[in-house]
Regions:
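Short glycine/proline-enriched coil/turn segments at helix->beta-strand junctions
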Residues: 22-24, 73-76, 94-97
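Conserved beta-strand hairpin/beta-sheet module of binuclear metal-dependent hydrolase folds
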Residues: 1-44
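Short, structurally constrained coil/turn elements
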Residues: 1, 47, 73, 93-95, ...
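Metallo-beta-lactamase
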Residues: 83-114
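Active-site metal-binding motif and surrounding structural segment of the metallo-beta-lactamase
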Residues: 34-81, 85
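Fold-independent oxyanion-binding glycine-rich loops
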Residues: 10-11, 30-31, 82-83, 102-104
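Short secondary-structure boundary/capping segments
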Residues: 18, 45, 71, 106-107
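Short, solvent-exposed polar/charged micro-motifs at secondary-structure junctions
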Residues: 16-17, 58-60, 108-112
């Protein structure tokens, strides 16, 4: 299956990438504030509502600060994280995301992607 990988930013001021394959769009980390996140997606012709899932690698703000903005615009978004990362991030959120928990080091699947 073919895929496209777009790096929106990678630095101490924010990390964010998009993986697209077979009509599925997964954001890898959401390390930008809402307006920057939206502008970065718009450059790809996308909006927050077009995302199917986000995978948060860890709880540092340069990897997850935009999660609340994503969830405001896409409440059904699936959020992948390991249990400890989810626990730490949940404390800062006003809503409860659709957490998809995985064990670090294991393989998991989402819409045919592993």
């Amino acid at each position: 299956m073919a895929f496209a990988f777009h790096i929106l930013g990678t630095s101490s001021s924010g990390n964010c990438s998009i993986l697209e394959s077979g009509g599925t769009r997964i954001m890898l980390d959401a390390g930008f504030q809402g307006p920057r996140l939206e502008a970065s997606l718009a450059k790809l012709g996308l909006a927050c509502a077009a995302l199917d899932a986000v995978l948060i690698t860890h709880e540092h703000s340069d990897h997850c600060i935009g999660l609340a903005a994503l969830l405001r615009q896409n409440p059904a978004l699936k959020v992948f994280a390991n249990r400890e990362t989810a626990r730490r991030i949940q404390g800062a959120l006003k809503v409860k995301p659709d957490w998809q928990l995985f064990e670090t080091g294991t393989t998991f699947e989402f819409r045919g992607l592993q």
